[in-house]
Each structure stands twice: as structure tokens, then as C-alpha cells.
Amino acid sequence: MRKILSVLLSIAAVFIMCSCTLVSASAPGTEYGSFTIEKTSSYDGKYYAYMTQHDQMIVVNIYSEDDNEVFTFEPCRKSDFWGICWENDSYNLWVQSGDLGILCYTMSDEVWSLDLDAVRPDYIISKYDELGA
């Protein structure tokens, strides 16, 4: 009886671990809103952003279309990072963070700077908007 119970518990543990993995794998497509954690290009393809990690921080690396690094910045801790999103008609880049909220980085002369006065366009949907927060 103990052996059967042990086997059943092992099967249940494997099932739970597989279920959790499937949920995690689907998170970017279903829970990030307009934001992504994947490589993403500006509206015209002139720039693309790619995220890496350094210590406990997320690093946003911005490259030109010919793969030259243009600018790099660290917007938030990796544990709070929920993705980035380009605006549809500019090079403004929005960062979604669990502790800082949604922040805009505007570009001037290929330098992206935090713009606390920026107004998020309606078409950029936060994961928090979708959750009703």
C-alpha cells in the first residue's frame, strides 16, 4: 500500500511540475499586455531592443538596424521586470515594472532618457490594465 501511495505521489508531483512549466511558458503571450520580454523593433525597424541581465538588474540594449549598439540602460530590477514596448510612431520606449509602474524613455540624439511627464498612449496596454488594476 505504501509503495502504491509513493508512486501516486510521484506521479502527482510530476504532473504539477509540468503544469507549472506550461503556465510559465505561456505567460509572455497572455499576461504582459502590449509589452514583451523578447527582442522587439521600433515602428520603422530602425532600432531594436534586446534585454539582458546584469547582477540583479535588467539591461535594455538598443541597436541600430545594422546591429551596432546605440544605447544601453538599466530601468529596473529583473525580479520586477514585465517587458518593454515601443510607441507606434516614435522611438519612445515604455518599460513595465512591478514596483516602479510603467515608465517612458524618450529618445533624443540616440540617447534614451527617463521622461516622467510622458503620457502613455491608449494603444499601449499594461498587464495591470488587463487585470483590472
What do the predicted segments below correspond to?
Residues 33-40, 77-86, 121-132:
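Repeated scaffold domains used in trafficking and secretory/extracellular systems
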Residues 4-24:
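Sec-dependent N-terminal signal peptides of Gram-positive bacterial secreted proteins and lipoproteins
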Residues 71-75, 113-120:
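Beta-propeller fold detector
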Residues 80-83, 91, 100, 118:
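Intrinsically disordered, low-complexity regulatory regions of eukaryotic proteins
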Residues 45-53, 89-102:
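Short beta-strand elements that form the blades of beta-propeller/WD-repeat-like
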Residues 20-76:
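N-terminal export/targeting and maturation segments
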Residues 95, 100-110, 114-115:
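Short, exposed beta-strand-loop hairpins at the edges of beta-sheets
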